[in-house]
């Protein structure tokens, strides 16, 4: 589908992954509507792409406001006509390094409003319009490895990403998701450490190979290659397999399993047999 992507909407498009996605689509010839609450930065980045010859529209929008998101959807369909890709990408890091009881409630609420509530609003505004048109389309939710792996002092961010993962899973096109049997595919993007302004000053995670961080352009490449496919989980960092295995191993250790029945034994013990010698008279 990426070769047929003619129109895309990207939220959180003023910087980081959102900007990289917008640039990837625009440089491939697609029309792009870029949305962000940071209007100044958004319009500067859009102007840079337009100077390259891109077909870009910048829309300043508070994505936590239902009316603003509805206006964004109306503008996007008016400007682009049919839309092939919606990247539900707006996000903030919020407070990190603090235990839950020290995080100001207003800050935690803000993180949930941007990382979760805004994604719900975008899905509610765009998906019905995509279904009405009946054409193939792809909805990309940007979650995080923090939707699976949680560290100390990350309650607000990790909890909001867990919530967004749940929304994406409820929407997915294969059973039992809400979009089963439709032409709208859903994927959830789960990057690890990405070198963007949002994480400047934070310590990069260390893996077996050292620093496992990637660029925003690397992440955009993962999304580009997945467009039109049935891939639901999109991982961008080399340490993802190890981190996921450790997480699910930890879960599995706490699952109370009943003793297997003989039919379920993976390696059943062979039954003992007694040889009988027959004597034949001649």
UniProtKB/Swiss-Prot annotation:
Q: Which CDD domains match?
A: SDR_c
Q: Which GO terms describe its molecular function?
A: oxidoreductase activity
Q: Which UniProt keywords apply?
A: Antibiotic biosynthesis, NAD, Oxidoreductase
Tell me the active site.
Answer: 157 (proton acceptor)
According to UniProt, this protein's pathway is: Antibiotic biosynthesis; pentalenolactone biosynthesis
Q: Which annotated residues bind substrate?
A: 144
Question: Biological process GO annotation list?
Answer: antibiotic biosynthetic process
Residue ranges annotated as compositionally biased, kind Low complexity, are 267-282
Q: Which reaction does it catalyse?
A: 1-deoxy-11beta-hydroxypentalenate + NAD(+) = 1-deoxy-11-oxopentalenate + NADH + H(+)
The residues listed in the UniProt record as binding NAD(+), with positions renumbered to this chain, are: 12-36, 161
State the residue spans of region: Disordered.
258-282
Enzyme Commission number, as recorded:
1.1.1.340
Family, according to the entry, reads as follows: Belongs to the short-chain dehydrogenases/reductases (SDR) family.
Known function? Catalyzes the oxidation of 1-deoxy-11-beta-hydroxypentalenic acid to 1-deoxy-11-oxopentalenic acid in the biosynthesis of pentalenolactone antibiotic.
**UniProt-listed NCBIfam families:** HdxpentlteDhPtlF (NF045814)
> Under what name is this protein listed?
1-deoxy-11-beta-hydroxypentalenate dehydrogenase
Native species: Streptomyces arenae
Give the taxonomic lineage as stored in the record. Answer: Bacteria, Bacillati, Actinomycetota, Actinomycetes, Kitasatosporales
């Amino acid at each position: 589908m990426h070769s047929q992507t003619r129109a895309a909407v990207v939220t959180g498009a003023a910087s980081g992954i959102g900007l990289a996605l917008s640039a990837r689509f625009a440089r491939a010839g697609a029309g792009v509507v870029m949305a962000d609450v940071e209007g100044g930065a958004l319009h500067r980045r859009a102007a840079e792409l337009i100077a390259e010859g891109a077909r870009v529209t910048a829309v300043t929008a508070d994505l936590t406001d239902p009316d603003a998101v509805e206006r964004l959807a109306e503008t996007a369909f008016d400007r682009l006509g049919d839309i092939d890709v919606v990247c539900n990408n707006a996000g903030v890091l919020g407070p990190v390094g603090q235990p839950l009881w020290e995080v100001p409630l207003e800050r935690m609420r803000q993180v949930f409003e941007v990382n979760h509530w805004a994604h719900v609003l975008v899905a509610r505004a765009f998906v019905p319009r995509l279904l009405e048109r009946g054409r193939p389309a792809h909805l990309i939710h940007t979650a995080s490895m923090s939707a699976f792996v949680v560290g100390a002092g990350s309650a607000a961010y990790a909890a909001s990403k867990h919530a967004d993962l749940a929304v994406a899973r409820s929407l997915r096109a294969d059973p039992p998701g809400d979009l089963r049997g439709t032409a709208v595919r859903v994927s959830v993007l789960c990057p690890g450490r990405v070198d963007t302004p949002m994480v400047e000053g934070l310590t990069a995670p260390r893996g077996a190979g050292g620093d496992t961080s990637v660029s925003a352009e690397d992440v955009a490449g993962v999304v580009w290659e997945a467009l039109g496919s049935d891939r639901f989980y999109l991982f961008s960092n080399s340490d993802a397999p190890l981190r996921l295995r450790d997480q699910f191993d930890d879960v599995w250790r706490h699952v109370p399993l009943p003793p297997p029945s003989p039919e379920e034994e993976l390696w059943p013990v062979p039954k003992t047999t007694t040889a009988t010698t027959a004597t034949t008279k001649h």
